[in-house]
């Protein structure tokens, strides 16, 4: 099986690297690693109906909100996010976190993050256009939470 491009996609200070893309796994899974700097609050609360997402902590701690519950994911911790569950995460701690995300089936790919990065870059350091962010999210199967 071929592996992902390992291209680093940057959205502000957030860095994403795909290790396995859906096209590499026959569509069964996509795996990406992401680094979130201390103090970062990302992304917009959202859900996805077409795939499950499992998060595995490597370094640092991310604080997830999943269906209204607060869950900290640190090194060695795993969090399963079922289809349709509203979630988001922040790095409320003093160190950068590194986390692995496993998406099954592997329908979320680097194109989504590239498009989000382009919207963020167009904001020139200001807040990204929420309408444009929502359009990109919906195009890639994510539903922004109200």
Predicted regions, residues:
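Short acidic-glycine-tyrosine-enriched beta hairpin
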Residues: 8-9, 68-86
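A short glycine-rich, His/Asp/Glu-containing loop-to-beta-strand
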Residues: 9-45, 51-52
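Structural motif
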Residues: 15, 54, 61-63, 70, ...
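Short, conserved beta-strand element in jelly-roll/cupin
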Residues: 33-37, 47-65, 102-104
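Short beta-strand segments
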Residues: 43-45, 66-71
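Ligand-binding loop in jelly-roll beta-barrel domains
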Residues: 63, 83-110
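Acidic/histidine-enriched, glycine/proline-rich intrinsically disordered or flexible terminal extensions
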Residues: 114-146
